C-alpha cells in the first residue's frame, strides 16, 4: 500500500533528484494502526521499493529514514487511542523524515538541493500528520481492539 500510494502522485524535484509524494499518509496510517514493527517495515521497505522503481539513488536512504519514521509513529501510537500521544508521534516522525532527507540532500546536492527538499518534505509530513494520523486515530478508536 505504501509503494502504491508513493507512486500514485510523484512530482519530481530536479534540485535534489527526488520527488514529492504522499506515501507518508499511508506510512503514518499504518504505523498508528499496527504499531512500530509494521509501521517501520511498511515505511522503510514500501517506500524504498517505490524509490528502486523511480529514484534508485535514494532507495537506501529512504529505507532508513522512512523506516525510522514508521517506528517512531508506531511506538507513540501503540496501545493507545489518546489523540495527543498519536499526534506527538506523527509530528516527531514527520520531523525525523524531514531532517533525514534534508541532511542527505545537503550532503549529496548542496544547499540548493537541501532547500528544495525541505519544502517538499514539509508538505509530505504535514499531509501525513493531518490525513494519515487523523484517519489512523479515527479508525483506531473504532476498530482498535481488532488490530491489537
From Swiss-Prot:
Gene3D superfamilies: 1.10.1760.20. GO terms for cellular component: membrane. Pfam families: ECF-ribofla_trS (PF07155). This is Uncharacterized protein in gap 3'region.
Amino acid at each position: 500500500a505504501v509503494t502504491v500510494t508513493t507512486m500514485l502522485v510523484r512530482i519530481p524535484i530536479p534540485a535534489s533528484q527526488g520527488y514529492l509524494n504522499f506515501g507518508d499518509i499511508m506510512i503514518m496510517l499504518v504505523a498508528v494502526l499496527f504499531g512500530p514493527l509494521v509501521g517501520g517495515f511498511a515505511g522503510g521497505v514500501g517506500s524504498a521499493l517505490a524509490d528502486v522503481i523511480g529514484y534508485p539513488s535514494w532507495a537506501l536512504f529512504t529505507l532508513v529514514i522512512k523506516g525510522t519514521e514508521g517506528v517512531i509513529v508506531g511506538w507513540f501510537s501503540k496501545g493507545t487511542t489518546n489523540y495527543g500521544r498519536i499526534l506527538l508521534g506523527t509530528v516527531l516522525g514527520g520531523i525525523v523524515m524531514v531532517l533525514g532527507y534534508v541532511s542527505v540532500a545537503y550532503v549529496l546536492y548542496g544547499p540548493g538541493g537541501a532547500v528544495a527538499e525541505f519544502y517538499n518534505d514539509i508538505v509530505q509530513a504535514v499531509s501525513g500528520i493531518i490525513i494519515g494520523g487523523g484517519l489512523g486515530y479515527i479508525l483506531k478508536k473504532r476498530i482498535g481492539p481488532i488490530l491489537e
